[in-house]
């Protein structure tokens, strides 16, 4: 496997309308810790979605789904491995940035991966670390508040 593309993705006009109602640079976008191939990719690969998000978003924050070399849920780590990508927060960040250049302003990693941020390849990235495991609703609310 060399890549994974969803070719039938199509824009939802209601989403376009909602984004346009907000005005330019009036929203913050958080890309949750979802599978970049099966969850985020089909959305970001919709024609013109990237340019629309960059035009409308004040900032885009992406949360890594990889913690300590594994995905907490789902096949993201398996897909990364099959594509020959390093299964790490750093590997995810570099792949996302290559696939969706200039989309993400701030990268959020779990504190377990903080040491990876010292890589020369990542020096120009705004990487923040915190506990990203949302084990209950109260922790999820705290994390959401921290993100915003």
Predicted regions and their residues:
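Alpha-helix C-terminal capping/helix-to-coil transition sites in glycosyltransferase folds
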Residues: 25-26, 55, 103
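C-terminal functional extensions of proteins
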Residues: 72-148
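Internal active-site segments that recognize and position negatively charged phosphoryl groups
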Residues: 1-51
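Structural motif
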Residues: 28-31, 59, 106
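Short beta-strand segments
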Residues: 32-34, 63-64, 108-110
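Redox- and metal-dependent alpha/beta enzyme cores, enriched for Fe-S-associated oxidoreductases
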Residues: 42-86
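Short glycine-rich anion-binding loops that position phosphate/pyrophosphate groups of nucleotides
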Residues: 35-39, 66, 113
């Amino acid at each position: 496997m060399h890549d994974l593309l969803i070719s039938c993705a199509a824009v939802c006009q209601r989403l376009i309308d909602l984004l346009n109602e907000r005005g330019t640079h009036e929203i913050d976008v958080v890309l949750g810790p979802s599978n970049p191939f099966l969850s985020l990719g089909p959305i970001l690969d919709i024609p013109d979605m990237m340019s629309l998000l960059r035009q409308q978003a004040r900032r885009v924050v992406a949360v890594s789904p990889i913690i300590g070399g594994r995905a907490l849920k789902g096949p993201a780590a398996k897909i990364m491995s099959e594509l020959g990508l390093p299964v790490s927060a750093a590997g995810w960040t570099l792949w996302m940035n290559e696939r969706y250049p200039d989309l993400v302003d701030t990268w959020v990693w779990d504190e377990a991966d903080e040491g990876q941020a010292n890589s020369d390849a990542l020096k120009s990235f705004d990487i923040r670390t915190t506990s990203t495991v949302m084990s209950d609703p109260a922790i999820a609310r705290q994390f959401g508040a921290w993100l915003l």
